[in-house]
């Protein structure tokens, strides 16, 4: 997918260069061969105005391609981070419960190789350079103990989702949620008005970020439940 986006971006850049050259060549030929007092409908210079409009639209498309490439890279990084975490949790579960997992399927092996992960007979292994420190594991792996979101984990969340959320503010809000649900084991989901009533610094970006990190659960009404 990354290669396809790169090729598309290169094609747009080449097309832009070709149009630039064509415009300069046509402008020179028209200025040399067409009288200045020729009729407007017969004057090829009008074609250059249309070409300029086409170039403007083409430049806008190039910008969109670059934005798509950036978002695609962020999405791939986020997928790798979450897959790394899942693999580590599965390995920890296997070691703790002494359970033998099913053999990795051919499809799973191809997916792991595509993401740069090594595969043995039963599990997908995370390369050392991609392993997450213990403090970066999601809260669900820490047996109910509060663990702050790390800067690396936050940066793995797509910019379109986390917006301008600050790490300190996100952790402060997450801690408020954790303390509330820790003391109220059987309490229902929290509504937005209830959170504001409790002076929680809630925002849509914070909720989406924590949901993306699988730390909270949001229902259709926007009610929040902590995933302990």
Curated annotation (Swiss-Prot):
Q: Name one Pfam family in it.
A: SKA2
Question: One MF term in GO for this entry?
Answer: microtubule binding
Subcellular localization, per the record? Answer: Cytoplasm, Cytoskeleton, Spindle; Chromosome, Centromere, Kinetochore
Tell me the domain of life.
Eukaryota
InterPro entries in alphabetical order = Ska2, Ska2_N
As for family, the record states: Belongs to the SKA2 family.
The job of this chain, per UniProt, is described as: Component of the SKA complex, a microtubule plus end-binding complex of the outer kinetochore that stabilizes spindle microtubule-kinetochore attachments, promotes alignment of chromosomes at the mitotic spindle equator (chromosome congression) and assists suppression of the spindle assembly checkpoint. Kinetochores, consisting of a centromere-associated inner segment and a microtubule-contacting outer segment, play a crucial role in chromosome segregation by mediating the physical connection between centromeric DNA and spindle microtubules.
Question: What is this protein identified as?
Answer: SKA complex subunit 2
Taxonomic source organism:
Salmo salar (Atlantic salmon)
Q: What is the lineage of its organism?
A: Eukaryota, Metazoa, Chordata, Craniata, Vertebrata
